[in-house]
Amino acid sequence: MIIIVIFLMCLKIVLNNIIIWSTLNQTVFLNNIFTINDTYGGLFWNTYYDNNRSNFTYCGIAGNYCSCCGHNISLYNTTNNCSLIIFPNNTEIFNRTYELVYLDKKINYTVKLLKSVDSPTITYNCTNSLITCKNNNGTNVNIYLIINNTIVNDTNGDILNYYWNGNNNFTATCMINNTISSLNETENINCTNPILKYQNYLSTLFYIIIFIVSGLIIGIFISIISVLSIRRKRKKHVEEIESPPPSESNEEDISHDDTTSIHEPSPREPLLPKPYSRYQYNTPIYYMRPSTQPLNPFPLPKPCPPPKPCPPPKPCPPPKPCPPPKPCSPPKPCRPPKPCPPPKPCPPPKPCPPPKPCPPSKPCPSPESYSPPKPLPSIPLLPNIPPLSTQNISLIHVDRII
């Protein structure tokens, strides 16, 4: 019940508010729909503008004639039934509400200016698949969107939005009209390559950066895995090279295993080569005796140290000076002075001792003589066993060759 009352009230408000569109210099007729009783002849026309209400004119009926007073006769006039006639020779009368009041009854007329339309604006966005039609100037307009000669959407507002799907290459026409004019605008839409049509290039740049960073991260991850794998293989190879050679007992066991590797497989033994075998199916078999010599070569003999240099000879001492002659006494004649003795010769320098001979280097051990491998025993094959060349097995597995 409450819903019905609200609906009737809204319907009454809508029916009592009438919008009239008119152009400049076009006569506007506001009809009086009330039946006026001669006993109650008072009737009012009021105006509303910018939420301000003012009394426009007062009318009274005497007999069948309506007489009004208080209005501008150059813009307004009344008929015999008190209907209002407007002469819109300027824009002052537009965007106003004229209220007709009789007793407890009211009706509102809103007069709006009707403008001719301009060419609409049509835009599209390939990223969102959106077409937009926009009104630029006209009033009381209807907008229609036509795609491939078919109306797909319409509105009586100023903006029309439409999302399309499916085809990315078509023709769109935006048509706008009202009661006095009509115009349209056509656009050829081509979104077959959205990457080149993006209007929001920041989103495209964002995705490109994501792809580049992801590729770099994947490349770095693969490089790290490759480097670790190479280091692991290299370390394993170095450990195999630096491992000690097998002893003689192991050599005999290995040679014995090589010569007796032909056997019938047990039911539980798979007819497949050992893992990491260096030989594949149907390949020739080579026998090689492991070398017993160490991998490292014999050290070279140490060189002889150089002989110590001889010390320099000591210098000779200087000769002693001759003593002065003694003075003569007066009666005796003076004797000639004795000659000075010759200086003693310097002793010859001691000869340098001969250098010590180098100790003889230790003789290298004689290399082990090579002995030919033992011949394989001839084992006769049964008639129903096919030759070895047709069997998909590896007879001898050499896990390591030095």
From Swiss-Prot:
Localisation: Host cell membrane; Virion membrane; Host Golgi apparatus
Name assigned to this protein: CD2 homolog
Family from the record: Belongs to the asfivirus CD2 homolog protein family.
Biased composition (Basic and acidic residues): 256-267
Entry text on domains: The C-terminus contains repetitive amino-acids that may function as a cell-penetrating peptide.
Protein's organism: African swine fever virus (strain Badajoz 1971 Vero-adapted)
PTM notes: Cleaved into two fragments of 63 kDa and 26 kDa containing respectively the glycosylated N-terminus and the nonglycosylated C-terminus. A full-length 89-kDa glycosylated form also exists.
Mutant phenotype after disruption: Highly attenuates the virulence in vivo.
